[in-house]
């Protein structure tokens, strides 16, 4: 009976910690443009999905492509998108919809440098809905980074700026 009480106390403490971390995550992690992009590509059907870096974000316009080709598209390019990020975004898209084409804009600079840890490290992963791609992305990329990045994804954001936004998060 004594061991049972210890187990129950441990479960309660873990549940409280998980709830607290989830609440802090919801309150302090800023809403990013990536959230909108990931939501768009998993919720809507597009003929073409464009992945890549900041060059693709500024230089490839899906609306112009649609005018010329008649095919719908969405641009998920963003600065700091490494090959591994694009791969798992493509995997997520393939799980959720079946685009006719995935266009990948390549910046060779991202293949000769290591992905830096920091608040940009979770930019993509944090916005993925629960899926097989998210679990694989975690084990192949995110699990190798600093544990604070996984448990406290908001730790690198300026709290002075974000605290003023907390009220807006819940209204």
Protein language model regions, located:
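Phosphate-binding glycine-rich loops and adjacent basic patches that engage nucleotide phosphates
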Residues: 21-29, 45-55, 160-171
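N-terminal hydrophobic targeting signals that begin at the initiator methionine
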Residues: 1-3
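Hydrophobic membrane-insertion alpha-helices, especially the h-region
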Residues: 5-27
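Extracytoplasmic/secreted cell-surface and envelope-processing proteins
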Residues: 58, 83-86, 110-119
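Proline-aspartate-enriched helix->loop->beta-strand connector
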Residues: 98-100
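Serine-esterase "nucleophile elbow" of acetyl-processing enzymes
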Residues: 28-81, 87, 92-95
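Short beta-strand segments
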Residues: 104-105
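Secreted/periplasmic serine-hydrolase-like ester/acetyl group-modifying domain
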Residues: 119-171
């Amino acid at each position: 009976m004594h061991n049972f009480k210890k187990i129950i106390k441990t479960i309660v403490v873990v549940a409280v910690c998980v709830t607290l971390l989830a609440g802090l995550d919801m309150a302090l992690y800023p809403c990013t443009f990536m959230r909108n992009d990931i939501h768009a590509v998993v919720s809507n059907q597009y003929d073409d999905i464009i992945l890549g870096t900041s060059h693709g974000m500024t230089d490839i316009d899906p609306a112009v492509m649609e005018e010329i080709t008649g095919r719908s598209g969405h641009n998920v390019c963003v600065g700091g998108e490494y090959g591994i990020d694009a791969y798992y975004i493509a995997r997520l898209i393939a799980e959720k919809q079946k685009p006719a084409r995935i266009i990948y804009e390549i910046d060779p600079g991202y293949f000769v440098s290591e992905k830096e840890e920091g608040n940009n490290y979770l930019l993509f992963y944090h916005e993925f809905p629960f899926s097989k791609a998210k679990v694989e992305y975690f084990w192949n990329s995110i699990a190798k980074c600093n544990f604070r990045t996984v448990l406290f994804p908001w730790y690198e954001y300026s709290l002075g700026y974000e605290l003023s936004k907390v009220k807006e998060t819940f209204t």
